[in-house]
Regions:
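ATP/NTP phosphate-donor binding region
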Residues: 1-94
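A glycine/threonine-rich phosphate-anchoring loop and its flanking beta-alpha core
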Residues: 16, 113-170
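Glycine-rich nucleotide phosphate-binding loop and flanking beta-alpha elements
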Residues: 26, 48, 103-105, 126, ...
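Structural motif
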Residues: 40-42, 97-99, 159
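Short glycine-/acidic-enriched loop or helix-start segments at secondary-structure transitions
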Residues: 51-53, 107-109, 130-132
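Short C-terminal domain-edge/linker segments immediately following a structured domain
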Residues: 70-75, 98-101, 149-156
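A short, small-residue-rich loop immediately preceding and capping a beta-strand
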Residues: 88-111, 115-126
Length: 170
């Protein structure tokens, strides 16, 4: 085995905490409470609309605040990552919560890496591995692949709410 492959195998990043099941989004406050007090929630428009009420309920008892709910921009592009990172820093958020499909989750992870903040992912579809991996696939704003952004860490938390995923259109 080559030395570079051996080095890669000695460091195996994995999400800090994974919660799954019906109603799992209710644990958002518990997961985020140890990481910060002010959440920046970003995601797809539909994903945010369908989870907003549950997100508020999930953080209510934990005494956390939401700095913003923001659309991720439609593509995991450098432009969207930079714009969202600037907003995160101006809001003084200390935890990123990314909600939606692969591109939304990848954008959230990239924003977290740029801002050096923990990221909790909430996948709303079961089609990708974006919720758990230390990788963001990037595109330009036309949706054309531009590359892979390899991150140092996986999300610190992953919430797989099966009631949300089961309600996803086929």
């Amino acid at each position: 085995m080559s030395e570079s492959i051996n080095k890669q195998l000695t460091r195996l990043p994995f999400p800090g905490k994974i919660v799954r099941g019906t109603g799992a989004l209710a644990s958002l406050g518990e997961i985020c409470r140890t990481q910060g007090k002010k959440l920046y929630v970003l995601g797809g428009k539909t994903a945010l609309a369908k989870t907003k009420q549950s997100i508020y309920a999930g953080i209510a008892q934990a005494g956390l605040d939401i700095a913003a709910f923001a659309w991720y921009g439609g593509e995991c592009s450098q432009e969207n990552i930079d714009k969202l990172a600037e907003d995160v820093l101006s809001c003084q958020a200390d935890v990123i919560v990314a909600v939606g499909g692969g591109k939304a989750l990848d954008t959230g992870k990239a924003v977290g890496a740029k801002c050096n903040l923990p990221v909790v992912t909430v996948p709303t579809i079961a089609a990708t591995c974006a919720a758990v991996t230390p990788l963001s696939v990037t595109y330009n704003n036309k949706g054309e692949f531009t590359g892979n952004l390899f991150l140092d860490d996986c999300p610190t938390g992953v919430i797989v709410d099966t009631s949300i995923i089961l309600a996803t259109p086929v």
